[in-house]
Amino acid sequence: MFKNYLIISVLILLVSCSDSAYFDPGPCPRAAILKGNETKEMNNSDLVVELNRTIMICEYNLRRKNINFDVGVFGDVINSDTVTLNNLNINIFVAFVGPDDLIIDKWSKSVSVKLKNQKISSFSLPIEGLRSKIEEGRTGSSYKVIIGLE
């Protein structure tokens, strides 16, 4: 009985005195499209660009208190059969949002989407090598990654 009590006491002591520099931030922040399903009509054409869904992978660097992440964006270009373009350039932004909806970092990326001679051309875009700061004591669920069209 005393042996079990001693083991539990030692474990509690170790956990309570552990170094706070190695906090567990938990899962990756949630990546979402700005309006749930963002649509934008392109100037001087019938083209409509639509962002549908995202995927995100992340890695925490706890010593430097930052997060490295990559985002994948999936979408469609609608009415691509009505234009003679082979490629369409679109501008996408990625915002890393912290607690209280404070924007910590924002990036813009101009990407080229290859159009097919179809009513709807689907695309997927990798956005890699993003890095942002995190606060100690905050978990991954305290942050969001918002993606949209500029």
Identify the role of each PLM range.
Residues 88-101, 145-149:
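Extended low-complexity, serine/threonine- and proline-enriched intrinsically disordered segments
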